[in-house]
C-alpha cells in the first residue's frame, strides 16, 4: 500500500490481515477497489469500517472481511468464469474483476443493477457483465461457470445452480434461515459429486426468487 494511503484505508488492510486474510492477490484487490464509491453518500466517511452498511432497495453492502473471506475461499485464477448472484452495490463484483477475466453478476432490482453498472464502468471494470435477472432461474444461454458466489442467504442451494458449476468448480453461499444467522458453505464439484463444507457463521439479506416489480 502506498505510504500516502489514508489512515482509515491502512487500518482496513491491517484488520483484514489480522482476521486471517492472507492471499496477497485478494488483499491487493481489496486495496484497489474504493469502497467509498459503493456506499450511500452519507456513509462515505465510514466506508472503511469493517461492517455491513445499508444501500438502496432495502439491501446491504457486505462487511469487507466477509467480502475478502468469500473471495479467498473461491481460489480464483485469471482464466475463471465467475457468476455472482446478488450484485447489490457492485462492490463484490469490482473485487472479483481484479482477480479474474470474466464476471457475470445478476441482480433482481433494476435500480441496483443500473447503479452498479455505472460504478463498475467508472472504475473500468469492463470484464463485468451486469444482468437484471433471477438468480434462481438463469437463462439457458448463461452457460457454465468455474466459480459461483452467492451474496444473499438461501435456505438451500438449488441443484439447478450447482449444475452450473464446471468440473472442479467451487460455489460459495450463505445457507440458512432468511432472518438470523446462516452458515457460509463452500461446495466443490468433482465429476457428478458435490462436496460440501461449512465454514463460518454469517448474516445476509435473503435471496428472493424473481425480478422485483418495483425499484
Swiss-Prot record:
MF terms (GO), sorted A to Z: protein-L-isoaspartate (D-aspartate) O-methyltransferase activity
Compartment(s): Cytoplasm
Coiled-coil ranges from the UniProt annotation: none
EC number: 2.1.1.77
Domain of life of the organism encoding this protein: Bacteria
Methyltransferase is among the record's keywords: yes
UniProt-listed SUPFAM superfamilies: S-adenosyl-L-methionine-dependent methyltransferases
Keywords, ordered alphabetically: Cytoplasm, Methyltransferase, S-adenosyl-L-methionine, Transferase
Name of the protein in question: Protein-L-isoaspartate O-methyltransferase
Gene: pcm
Amino acid at each position: 500500500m502506498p505510504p500516502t494511503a489514508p489512515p482509515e484505508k491502512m487500518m482496513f488492510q491491517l484488520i483484514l490481515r489480522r482476521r486471517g486474510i492472507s492471499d496477497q492477490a485478494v488483499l491487493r484487490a481489496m486495496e484497489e477497489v474504493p469502497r467509498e464509491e459503493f456506499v450511500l453518500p452519507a456513509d462515505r466517511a465510514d466506508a472503511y469500517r469493517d461492517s455491513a452498511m445499508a444501500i438502496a432497495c432495502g439491501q446491504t453492502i457486505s462487511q469487507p472481511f466477509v467480502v475478502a473471506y468469500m473471495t479467498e475461499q473461491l481460489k480464483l485464477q485469471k482464466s475463471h468464469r465467475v457468476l455472482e448472484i446478488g450484485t447489490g452495490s457492485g462492490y463484490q463484483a469490482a473485487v472479483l474483476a481484479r482477480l479474474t477475466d470474466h464476471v457475470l453478476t445478476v441482480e433482481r432490482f433494476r435500480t441496483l443493477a443500473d447503479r452498479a453498472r455505472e460504478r463498475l464502468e467508472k472504475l473500468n471494470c469492463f470484464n463485468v457483465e451486469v444482468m437484471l435477472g433471477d438468480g434462481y432461474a438463469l437463462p439457458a444461454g448463461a452457460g457454465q461457470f468455474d466459480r459461483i458466489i452467492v451474496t444473499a442467504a438461501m435456505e438451500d442451494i438449488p441443484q439447478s445452480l450447482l449444475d452450473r458449476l464446471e468440473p472442479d468448480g467451487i460455489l460459495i453461499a450463505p445457507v440458512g434461515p432468511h432472518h438470523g444467522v446462516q452458515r457460509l458453505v463452500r461446495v466443490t464439484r468433482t465429476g457428478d459429486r458435490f462436496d460440501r463444507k461449512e465454514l463460518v457463521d454469517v448474516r445476509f439479506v435473503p435471496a428472493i426468487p424473481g425480478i422485483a416489480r418495483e425499484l
